[in-house]
Amino acid sequence: MSSTTIEAGLSEKALLVHRALASLQEELEAIDYYNQRSDVSVDGTLKEVLDHNRDDEVEHAAMLLEWLRREVPAFDFQMGKILFKSGSIPDIAKGKTSAADDGRGLGLGDLK
C-alpha cells in the first residue's frame, strides 16, 4: 500500500476517508495486475478466471467510489459534474457543456 503515512490526531471522519482511499488504491492496483495477467495469458480458462477476478475488483472499486461520493462533498460535486456525460472530458470539467449533453433530460436541447 502506498499510503502508509497517516498524520497524528486525525478525526474519525478523516481516518474513514483515508481507509476508503487506501482501499481504493489497492483495488485499482489489483485491477491492473489481473488485467495485465489476462492480457498475456495463453490459456483460455486461466484468462476467463483472471477476467472474472478483475471484474470483481472493479465492483469493489465502484463501491468505494460510491462511499466516497456519499461521504465527501467534493467527490459528490465532481462526480456529478463529470461522470456519465458525453462530449470532451476536459470540456466537461471546464463546464463547457450544453444542457442537451449534461446527462439530464432527453438530450433535445433548447426547443424554444
What are these regions (language model features)?
Residues M1-K112:
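Iron-associated oxidoreductase/ferritin-like identity signal
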